[in-house]
Regions:
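RNase H-like, Mg2+-dependent phosphodiesterase core
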Residues: 1-78, 85-262
Length: 262
């Protein structure tokens, strides 16, 4: 049993395998593969399953980067996504992100498919590796004045400009073409293309943080929980207290029992 290290307890081996990184797992499993102890055998099996799952996840992310390059080419490629389109309070937020092909941000996906904690972690990694990140926020009163279609076009143009880049290609997820030059629309792009997914995550995390801050100013509207969307608690608060300056008046008519505004 050449590969067995008898001086190391089975519990220690199991702990080592459980904490091993994706890159470390194959060598560790090879090192302990002839160890006959059941705890070690089970730990190796769990590690291999974890490695296989992570490998599949990395292949998914690799595909997102490859499609980004396929559609965008070798020039400056920026991904754009928005959050807050359907909310009744708070801004419309658009983010634009330029990602290099390397290093890759493992785990990126459509922000709606990620937990808040996962989005927070990924937003830090995206900020570390991105070539550029830009934001544009359209205030509720401006959304009321210009309408959502124009607001999105304005925000897309503003976010791309905020990157400081002149992109050769702008990849967008369902946003209106014509807002910026060299734009390409990709249906469900936030789940298919790396830079759009990154923009989706950054937009969501940034706007959510804004809504939590607004909640401290207007606690009666439950903005930290609802993020400005029409939750039952938020609707009831609108009916009870009327609207505050964060509300989109044009979105809230059905919720008001009186004409009382702010």
């Amino acid at each position: 049993m050449a590969n067995m290290t008898s001086s190391v307890s089975a519990s220690q081996v199991a702990g080592e395998l459980a904490s091993a990184t994706f890159e470390e797992i194959p060598a560790l499993v090879e090192h302990y593969r002839e160890d006959p102890r059941q705890q070690v055998i089970k730990a190796c099996e769990r590690a291999l399953k974890r490695h296989a799952k992570e490998l599949a996840e990395r292949e998914r992310v690799n595909d997102m980067y490859e499609l980004m390059h396929e559609l965008g080419g070798d020039g400056v490629v920026v991904g754009v996504d928005e959050v807050g389109r359907g909310s009744v309070a708070g801004p419309l937020t658009v983010c634009a992100v330029c990602l290099p092909m390397e290093p890759r941000v493992w785990g990126i996906n459509d922000s709606k498919k990620l937990t808040p904690a996962r989005r927070e972690l990924l937003s830090v990694k995206i900020a570390e590796v991105a070539t550029a990140i830009g934001f544009c926020h359209i205030a509720p009163k401006d959304i009321d004045e210009m309408g959502m279609a124009r607001a999105i076009r304005t925000a897309v143009a503003g976010a791309v400009a905020d990157t400081g880049l002149e992109p050769d290609c702008v990849l967008m997820d369902g946003n209106p073409l014509g807002a910026v030059p060299n734009a390409r629309d990709v249906v469900k792009g936030d789940a298919k293309i790396a830079c759009i997914a990154a923009a989706s995550i950054m937009a969501k995390v940034t706007r959510d943080e804004m809504m939590v801050e607004y909640d401290a100013e207007y606690p009666e509207y439950h903005l930290a929980e609802s993020k400005g969307y029409a939750s039952p608690e938020h609707i009831e608060a609108i009916r009870k207290h009327g609207l505050c300056p964060l509300h989109r008046v044009s979105f809230c008519g059905n919720f008001l029992q009186t004409e009382r505004l702010f």
